[in-house]
Swiss-Prot record:
Keywords: Host cytoplasm, Host Golgi apparatus, Host nucleus, Late protein, Virion. It comes from Elephantid herpesvirus 1 (isolate Asian elephant/Berlin/Kiba/1998). It comes from the Viruses. This is Protein UL24 homolog. InterPro entries: Herpes_UL24.
């Protein structure tokens, strides 16, 4: 059911809180800072793993508020933590399920998370393990304290690294990232680097082999040249 009885001002407050959270994550420069904002949902095993953040990614029917993608290249594991934010002006989450607005937000958020996880998990292939976690976090609007969060199961599948990289590149919301870059404070050193598409071990191996062949050819030409000079 649509929550038409929610005042326009409260809707604006919710949108503003979303943006405030996204800015805070964008400006954060470490795993710990981001994990504190997200109430500790990030896997501790990836504390030292390179990662990239995506906001309002266009996944077709869904646009997750935030995605954090960890790329463990040596182990060939991609871990995607997908987060949907819901906000409330109330000081507590109604566990008795009598708050109609919160219950609507809860069901809507669960559908959004479920659909987004399904879309990301659909990029199958070989060569890389893909783990997708989908979280729904309820924040109190004035304190940004997490009042409630869902604890999902992890969707695990095999994927093709470059196909998944192409999905991330295609779905990145460039205009929203540009908005974050312009609106964040001058203390921000810049957006986090996009990790996918940079690591290409297969290509680098081919290039190395090619370079070796070129070196060998050059050496052979040099030896032939010396032989010619000696015969002359």
């Amino acid at each position: 059911m649509p929550v038409n009885f929610v005042a326009a001002r409260k809707k604006r407050d919710g949108v503003n809180t979303h943006i405030e959270l996204q800015k805070a994550i964008y400006k954060s420069r470490s795993f710990t800072e981001i994990n504190n904002i997200l109430d500790g949902i990030l896997p501790d095993a990836h504390r030292e793993t390179p990662f990239a953040t995506y906001f309002e990614a266009n996944l077709g029917c869904r646009r997750p508020d935030c995605m954090i993608v960890f790329d463990d290249l040596p182990k060939q594991i991609i871990t995607c933590v997908l987060v949907e934010f819901k906000t409330t002006s109330r000081t507590a989450f109604d566990k008795r399920k009598k708050d109609a607005v919160q219950q609507y937000q809860l069901h809507q958020g669960e559908e959004q998370v479920r659909d987004a996880v399904k879309i990301l998990s659909s990029i199958t292939g070989r060569g890389c393990n893909l783990r997708v976690w989908g979280f729904l976090l309820f924040y109190q609007q004035s304190t940004l304290r997490v009042l409630h969060k869902t604890i999902p199961e992890c969707a695990v599948t095999l994927t093709d690294r470059w196909a998944f990289s192409a999905l991330l590149k295609k779905s990145k919301n460039e205009s929203f990232h540009a908005f974050l870059q312009k609106s964040c404070t001058a203390s921000t050193t810049g957006p986090q680097k996009e990790l996918f598409g940079i690591h290409k071990p297969e290509n680098s191996e081919v290039e190395t082999v090619g370079a070796t062949k070129s070196t060998r050819k050059g050496a052979e030409k040099s030896r032939l040249s010396r032989r010619s000079r000696k015969s002359n």
